[in-house]
Amino acid sequence: PEMGIYQIMEVLNVSRTANCVASVALGQRAIFEAYDFAKDRIAFGKPILEQPLLKAQFEEKLTSLKQAFALAWETVTLLDEVWLETPPYSDRYHLFRLMAHLGKYWTAEFAVQTAKWAMEVNAGLGTLKEFPVERWLREAMILSIWEGTPHRQILDGLEAMEQKGAHQLLLTHLAPYSDATEIDQWGQRISDHLGLPQDEKEAKAESLFSDLATFTANRLLHNKSL
């Protein structure tokens, strides 16, 4: 019985990692659905895919897809290293735990926003059940809710940083792909945040967590193995 909480954590570790992968896959499918429509939809004499604003948005979504993939892939890789661990957990496990929270939070939000955007690209047709794109938004919304809501990922990630020093492990992990100044600045920012009064620390945690996830994704993209 005393091992029950750890067995639950193992299930969540796997399911949150799977959620990261599912979010990337759904986002990629939504981008494809948007592309498939935009390349044939003519407005002002040319496909809307070639219109400057939408073209720029496609480029942004493809960049976000790469960032989401980087987070998901790193989460999978770390889980593969630590999934058989039992307490007391190693530093590598605590690094995985923070990565899983960052990945689940960021990739799920990516899936929701990308599916919503794909519906907008398809215009009125995007809202109709007869067309596939509206389904991706309905399915994307659950990805940010089950296996721990965004609030849960943020607060659990904060706890991993505060009690296990997981942010230090993460910054060390990212150091080979980062500028030393960036790493130092992030270390100071997180340290300052963890020193805030409890209510303020929680209230302001989302911007820190979101920025850290984005920074992590961008640094991982500099890893030549991705």
Question: Which residues does each PLM region occupy?
Answer:
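Flavin-dependent oxidoreductase catalytic core characteristic
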Residues: 1-226
